[in-house]
């Protein structure tokens, strides 16, 4: 890292551009011939891709790239990591969309009033495989240094301003997740991190899940990815707090 950047930490996170190999925000293009798109829809393991109407749900997407392989005229993955949204429906992209919209009007005013300068989060792995959890841990390493913005993770929900949930929300963790969230003082935020947290991912239809937590609690930030890149996490949190804008 020191050899690549000239210093240990990335100096300006706003100027970060990921490699072309990184699969970030997809661009969809409509074609009259839907043969390839229909093939991609049939191939998608989570039902994230639809041919008619042409759309891709990032909240379900595993970013495996198979849709782009079989339907290159319809879908192309860019290296844009700015894919967080304050709403679940904001993760659904359509033909012609050039970015994932982040409407500041959908952010509760108390979030920016109370947490703009400092935010402590409690992470709950709700049946995750460890990949998203490792990426969240990486946000605080010497390279990304999320702590420079006054944002970090704490062990106790009593010390936290909000909860970050990863994993598909299994039944075994349902009660513990509720207890943890209730232990955080108001006002608080709720972040769903990773495709599994957003939709259940590959396990969406599993009987082992219990996603009823989302029936009574509305997330403030949805961060797709399988796993979610540290830059996606950082960009989403800073945009939620009003410390940067989605241009």
Residue ranges and their predicted role:
Residues 113-116, 129, 182, 186, ...:
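Generic secondary-structure signature for well-ordered alpha-helical cores
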Residues 134-136, 144, 148-232:
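Cofactor-cradling patches in redox/metallo enzymes
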Residues 68-150:
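Flanking helices and flexible, charged tails adjoining ferredoxin-like Fe-S electron-transfer domains
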Residues 28, 37-85:
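Iron-sulfur cluster-binding cysteine motifs and their immediate structural context
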Residues 30-31, 59, 166-169:
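Structural motif
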Residues 1-47:
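Ferredoxin-type iron-sulfur electron-transfer modules and their immediate structural context
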Residues 39, 111, 177-181:
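Short amphipathic alpha-helical segments and helix-helix/interface helices
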Residues 223-247:
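A charged, well-structured terminal subsegment
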